[in-house]
Amino acid sequence: GNAAFVTITFNRIDSKIYVLDCINMTEPNPQKIRQTIEDLVLKYKPQEFRVEINAHQKAYSLDEDLRSWLSSYGVRLEAHFTGKNKWDTNFGVASMSTLFGTVRDGKFQGNNTIELPSTADSEGMKALVQQLITWKPNTRGKTDTVMALWFAVLRAREFMQQNSNMARYANNRWATRAQSSRKVSINLDEAFAEQWQENYG
């Protein structure tokens, strides 16, 4: 099989996910994979590197030398186990479809959360776009780049939730009595109007 690497960034200001790079490695071996990891870290200086640990890739999450090298550049290595959850329509790969925006009356609405770069000079990006177009649940075709994007999007969604104003108003069952006593009620109509004014006013 192939090994795929997708590099993204999440912009907290516009709440968009920007895909920076995609590498679709044919005939991967440990040396090529390690070199690609190092190249991506040096080029993009990420905060986190996610690795699927289902097959032989598990060795990377256990590789203390790699962990040490990554930490010397301030990069955390996170392991991701893929089970049947990848087919879950609310959480899995299919849930990314809404992030690419919607079409109404045959017209794109411009409401996408994911921005893809040009495919002109990148075979990896061409592969990602092609796999996104042809992806369907339980597919037997190549899905390496789509899966790599999904791992990255899972992390971006965590940032999106932290960035959401909803987190401020959500119930917290672990709140202390002091924190609970400082809770206040708000008028959602007024809060929405205020947020609308801040964002679009």
Language-model regions: role of each:
Residues 72-118:
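Short alpha-helix plus adjacent loop in nuclease-associated cores
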Residues 1-79, 115-201:
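RNase H-like, metal-dependent nuclease domains and their acidic two-metal-ion catalytic environment used
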